[in-house]
């Protein structure tokens, strides 16, 4: 068991429940971690504005990974501006193809916050990701299913590369970071970390690579892992 010096945690489906409500158990556990001097990193497919609000609400100090690794941020670095790692033009070319193919009948609806996204394009999840992946197989773009949305991203970035870059920026030892997630877009993220945790509601692919699969779902699973591996309770 590695010594945990930081915790990186996903948001939707990990510290929130199936209705995207923040679990009090996760809030309490993450604040307990911060009070113990262990920084918490928020890692999500959401935009930086949303992520910053979550980080402020929880009280985390470890930095942020946003837009599935396309953006990273930490107060006091880069003149307090986000660092953009992903190339949104790749997603834009794929989206232009979809618009040309389907016109007004396009079956994929862009989420309202897309104008604020700087590294990817995001659709509401009104269908499985496989048809979209097939449509865009000839494009230099990755299709991620976050459980709540479908994301078109630069294949050169993911939550894992975002974690690596943030760790370099803040001088974290990535081998001592516990990563907690639930969905497909957390696979690379967990692989990058030192100790991998999947909450009970996680997809099978994530459970297969996890060092520990929680008995509890959502935020209760986050609290379970923190109590067990950080505080030995």
What is each of the regions a protein language model found here?
Residues 213-216:
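Short acidic-hydrophobic, aromatic-tinged amphipathic segments that line or gate anion-handling sites
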Residues 228-233:
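Generic C-terminal helix-cap and adjacent flexible tail
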Residues 18-112:
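Active-site phosphate-binding/coordination module
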Residues 44, 68, 190, 211, ...:
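Residue-level signal for inorganic ion chemistry
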Residues 1-9, 169-172, 176:
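Non-catalytic pre-domain segments flanking phosphatase-related domains
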Residues 26, 51-55, 132, 206, ...:
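Hydrophobic packing residues within well-ordered alpha-helices of enzyme cores
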Residues 95-193, 197, 201, 207-209:
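Conserved acidic, metal-coordinating active-site core of Asp-based
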Residues 3-20, 190:
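Asp-based phosphoryl-transfer active-site loop
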């Amino acid at each position: 068991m590695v010594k945990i010096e930081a915790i990186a945690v996903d948001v939707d489906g990990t510290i929130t429940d199936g209705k995207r409500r923040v679990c009090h158990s996760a809030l309490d556990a993450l604040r307990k971690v911060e009070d113990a001097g262990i920084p918490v990193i928020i890692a999500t497919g959401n935009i930086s504005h949303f992520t910053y609000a979550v980080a402020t609400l929880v009280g985390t100090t470890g930095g942020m990974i946003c837009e599935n690794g396309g953006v990273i941020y930490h107060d006091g670095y880069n003149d307090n501006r986000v660092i953009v790692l992903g190339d949104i033009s790749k997603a834009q070319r794929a989206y232009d193809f979809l618009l040309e193919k389907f016109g007004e009948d396009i079956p994929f609806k862009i989420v309202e916050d897309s104008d604020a996204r700087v590294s990817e394009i995001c659709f509401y999840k009104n269908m499985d990701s496989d048809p979209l992946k097939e449509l865009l197989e000839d494009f230099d773009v990755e299709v991620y299913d976050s459980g709540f949305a479908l994301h078109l991203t630069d294949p050169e970035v993911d939550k894992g590369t975002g974690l690596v870059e943030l760790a370099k920026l803040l001088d974290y030892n990535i081998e001592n970071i516990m990563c907690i997630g639930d969905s497909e877009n957390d696979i690379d993220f967990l692989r990058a970390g030192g100790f991998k945790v999947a909450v009970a509601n996680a997809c099978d692919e994530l459970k297969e690579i996890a060092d520990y699969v929680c008995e509890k779902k959502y935020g209760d699973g986050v609290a379970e892992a923190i109590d067990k591996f950080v505080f030995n309770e």
